[in-house]
């Protein structure tokens, strides 16, 4: 190998000499004078090739040195095993390493396989060795860390010198306006938000997570550059939480890099916490490793490593991260600017927009609680990554509350409730497709009937459309270009067909199958058709992520003048439905994404209409820039459940694109037959399956009476009352209720009542000889409230009234 590299090196050096001679020849021909003002293309190309070859030579020289080092006789009588020589450690520690499958004789730290970044990894570091003054606690410290830090330090010194020069020569007085309107004086390129916070109070400065400068999140130690409006955000701000958890992800990334030695990928904050993905080349992550990872994180926190921001050119970053193909992909595919930013904490340097907390010591308590496998960017044809999840807080009290919340959420898990209450199940022979049992089907049908009843009130027309379409339909709609990977497709008679993942193109065919008049608009099509989406098997999760589902899907075809009224109607519709469930909600306006279809003027008009509707609705709303669908802006609605979690279900989308793609027209009042309608995509429940999961967990299996799968349990006092109990059950069932009768003679009366209460039966009707004689029932609830004896006919009428009203507390109101 060394001989091969040396041979390549000789060839490259000869090529450079040839290029230098050619450059000299061109310069002698008189081109030198024109280079400064109008460079000769041939000369410039030769120079570029020259620079590339110099870089290759540098790389080959480094590779040659490393190959020669590896070629030296190994310590175990085998050539080339220098890197694999075991680290000398106390015997006890070495045994622990063996137990955990860490680096031992002839192996590295990743289960005996080459490290994910082995091609750029130098001698495996001894546990506890320092790199640039930072102690590496893990079983390995990859060699690329040292090279990465060396380049970073050079660039950081240049950056600091530039910043010092700006502070010395460009600084000027600035006005800093605080959130309360108060103004303080500062100096550009010198005054930082942290200094502003200190000027107010030390307590404030200690509790501030991040600053917001002129509506942009800003590092606390980053100097202000001009007159600024400054907000100081604490952890109770959602934006501050995202920053806090993002910084925590970097701590986890530093730990994973040193512990596993793999290639870091993405490490973002999420709704509750953070995660980091790492490529480990086939090696997995074990929960047994969590304590070691947490201890390393605690050590990093204790060091109070500062977060440093540095803007670097893309070319230099490709050099800095050459050991990591994933970071290079991000740079090549995602970064379209000449420069971007990296952040450093300790030995970790990572591509990152930031901002971050001041130092790692701001993370007071951190817990690693879960791991999973995923694909690079969610694509099944790409590399498998290992993902580790964590959570962190600024005090231990919040961590304790979070742990209690997790326990409560675990008890409310819809998969557990579905199993315990016999609502539904899944099977490997149809992954991602739910089997709803009778009780689950009752919930499903009750929800759809609820929405259908609202359709009658709000003048929606229910339709039914095909499940399978020729791919030409999806090409026409634009979905084939943007969404075909998520569709189930197949060949029929040499034509490609696909199961529909949404209803809108079919509804466009229904609108356009005959001429339409302005008198028909608005035309509101509603459809509960079955939809299929080819979700990756690794992402399937109970009812929240499925392949087969139904939506309360509707599309409103209207004129431009009708948009405002229709949008208001949609918002009022969702408000009335969520009120029944007891949900509060948040509204988010999602605007034009990068991959949008259509003209920007149409997008601007659509966004303006949605904003106007939201303002008129009167509820608070937030802007979510760039998160709209590719065919139009939308309003996303997030509901809040009983334990404080948010879920996105409803959506309202304005679409100017599909009417154009399907050439939909109507005849206007003045006779113009080329007028284009507007489409409003609308769903309230969203996926019925997902809504059932949310309701399961929201109610904790304690269903409200109108929706409950076990509304009435009839219990006879003794065998002599069995026949009457069965008749009562039959009458209640025929009146439209989910009714059962307990005829188990092995249980006492009290045991039967207790079983019914534990099964969350809303009402328990006890019948004995007296009730049998009087055609009555003795009513009690699952919460053991006794309503006493009442005629069966009266009881059924009361139950009907409570069901019709969809009462939240029917048991109390009976």
Swiss-Prot record:
Pfam families: HGTP_anticodon (PF03129), TGS (PF02824), tRNA-synt_2b (PF00587), tRNA_SAD (PF07973). It comes from Xenopus tropicalis. Belongs to the class-II aminoacyl-tRNA synthetase family. Residues 62-142 are annotated as: Disordered. Catalyzes the attachment of threonine to tRNA(Thr) in a two-step reaction: threonine is first activated by ATP to form Thr-AMP and then transferred to the acceptor end of tRNA(Thr). Also edits incorrectly charged tRNA(Thr) via its editing domain, at the post-transfer stage. Residues 63-72, 88-102, 119-137 have a biased composition (Basic and acidic residues). It is found in: Cytoplasm; Nucleus. This is Threonine--tRNA ligase 2, cytoplasmic.
